Amino acid sequence: MSEHRIPVAADKKISPPISAGEQKGCKGLKRTDLMLRFAAFVCCTVTMVVLITDKQTSAIQVPGFNNLTITKTVSFDLAKAFVYLVSAAGIGAGYTLLVLVLSIISAERSKAIAWFIFVFDQLITYVLLAAAAASTEVAYMGAHAPPEASWLKVCSLFGRFCHQLGASLVTSLISTVLFAFSAAISAYYLFSNTNVRPAYSKG
């Protein structure tokens, strides 16, 4: 008589139950993440709008000719760094809005989405940092105009333009910091919970 072996199901690893304290911590961290991302969305949007609308026209006196003036208009496309900052802020705002929608409609994140958010959080943080740093350097050169650079002191002629530009630089730096904190949270969720539970647990 042939022996029939009954296949034994392989032991499955069961995730440990989530304690009430862990659930409360997950909820609090998720709430913090959502607030950070919403603030980053607002700052990126403000940066983009303020820069795009930054335009000023002034009459400039020609040196050596007392009665001769020319009309000059400056806008954000005066320097490629400002155009880069507008693009970076727009991408940051769009990406943040996408993550906010995903986080609101779904209580859990799959591993693939968690990796996607982690990678793009890092990427956009560095893109925003590079854009803000480059724009700040160009703005500094335009405001102080070092003699060795042979630059014109733009801010002495276009004060409102520079003030509006300065406001956009501040909001861009704030958005960079907010993205950095969000990136840290997404890294925590991914690497601490990959083998335990989805990034955002229900409950």
UniProtKB/Swiss-Prot annotation:
Write out the topological domains of type Extracellular.
53-84, 133-164
From the Swiss-Prot or TrEMBL record, state where the protein is found: Cell membrane
The answer, when asked if Cell inner membrane is one of the entry's keywords, is no
Q: How does it sit in the membrane?
A: Multi-pass membrane protein
Statement: the UniProt record of this protein carries the keyword Glycoprotein: yes
In this UniProt entry, which residues form the Cytoplasmic topological domain(s)?
A: 1-31, 106-111, 186-203
Segments crossing the lipid bilayer:
32-52, 85-105, 112-132, 165-185
Q: Which is one Gene Ontology cellular component term of this protein?
A: plasma membrane
By sequence similarity, the record places it as follows: Belongs to the Casparian strip membrane proteins (CASP) family.
Name-wise, this protein is: CASP-like protein 2U6
